[in-house]
């Protein structure tokens, strides 16, 4: 599975082998990036992740797989999956963020991960502006 997340002025396209690995990774990100937001999730493998990274201009890379947030990267993600949002890029990612948060809350509401649930159960504060 592929994920697209944003944390402050940075974003990342990543891969997890399955939902369990993804949720584990998100718990880790929450420890070190307390304001990250999930922009989108899609089926995909390591090759898909590498292909998307190949389309991202080198000047947008910050460190490792983290990039400086730019709507060009969001458009690369949409183009790769052949997504043409009818209401615009911002509305698409806002709705996908809400859906991802709801899925996480449903999956973890009966577990001891209280802080994890508390974080994703709040109304989205997704900010897609460019600084």
Question: For each of these PLM feature ranges, what is it?
Answer:
Residues 1-130:
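Non-catalytic accessory segments flanking enzymatic or RNA/DNA-binding domains
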């Amino acid at each position: 599975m592929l994920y697209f997340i944003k944390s402050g002025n940075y974003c990342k396209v990543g891969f997890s082998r399955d939902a369990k690995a993804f949720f584990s990774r998100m718990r880790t990100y929450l420890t070190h990036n307390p304001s990250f937001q999930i922009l989108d999730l899609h089926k995909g493998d390591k090759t898909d992740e590498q292909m998307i990274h190949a389309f991202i201009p080198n000047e947008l890379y910050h460190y490792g797989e983290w990039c400086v947030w730019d709507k060009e990267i969001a458009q690369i993600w949409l183009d790769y999956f052949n997504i043409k949002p009818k209401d615009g890029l911002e509305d698409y990612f806002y709705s996908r963020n809400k859906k991802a948060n709801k899925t996480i809350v449903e999956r973890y509401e009966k577990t001891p991960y209280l802080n994890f649930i508390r974080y994703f159960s709040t109304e989205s504060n997704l900010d897609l502006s460019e600084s």
